[in-house]
Amino acid sequence: MLKWGKTLMKKMLIIIVVLAGILISMIIYKNMAVSSKNNVNIQEIKKIEEKISKIYLWKEVTNEALPEFENVNNATELWIWEVLKKNIDKFEVSYDEIVQTSKEIFGQNINKEFPKSGNVSYKYDVEKDIYIPTEVTLDQMEDVFIISDIHKNEGGYEVEIIEYLEDYSNEQKVVIRNLVEEEIGQVSSSESETKIKEIVKENVSRFNKKKVFLKKEDNRLIVQKVTKIQE
């Protein structure tokens, strides 16, 4: 009887592990508009989504949540500073932290100068030799992306994303808009995020699409360039 009980417990444990794996897959793949056909596993997808989320901002602050650039050193100064601010969750930031975070996100080849002076993103305290982040004022439209495809190559990934806005100005509903703020669809505020993504997937041609080039460097992913996908 004891042996049978142990066997049953082992079987139940296996079932729980399998179900947990399925649940994790569902959570991650719900942000995929199209499943990748390039042998990209769940862990890779999670890391890719986390990386792009770190650099995906707010168009009311930086004009574009994710601007195009052929080389990160040519990306707009404001966007780079705001990416750093988003990823350094501190009220007082040292120069070394600014430089280190920039390399963690954009790689060792970034050669942007970070002058010790104030700008739109940071105030600079000369006496303390620190940067102090300025406040960010956001509107009621959330800038969002979903991954539509991932191409895995020897050095990293080419990731295609679809960009859209979730308008929360009405408490009773969420309006899905493209980047020119044209209404594409709407859901009630009680409906899940999955329903919103279904609407986006059904209207892919009406949204902006970009390709994000990610490179593997020092056991992390760094952003190389971003291009617009032309229809």
Question: Language model features by range: what are they?
Answer:
Residues K3-L19, N31:
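N-terminal Sec-pathway targeting helices
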Residues I24-N38:
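Membrane-interface motif at the C-terminal end of an N-terminal transmembrane signal
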Residues N38-I147:
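Core segments of small alpha/beta cavity-forming domains
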Residues N39, F207-E231:
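Short beta-strand edge/turn micro-motifs at domain boundaries
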Residues Q140-F145, S205-K211:
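Short, surface-exposed coil-to-beta transition loops
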Residues D149-E158, L214-R220:
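A short, structured loop/turn motif at beta-sheet edges
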Residues I161-L165, K225-T227:
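A mature extracytoplasmic/lumenal domain signature
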Residues D167-R206:
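Mixed-charge, low-complexity intrinsically disordered segments
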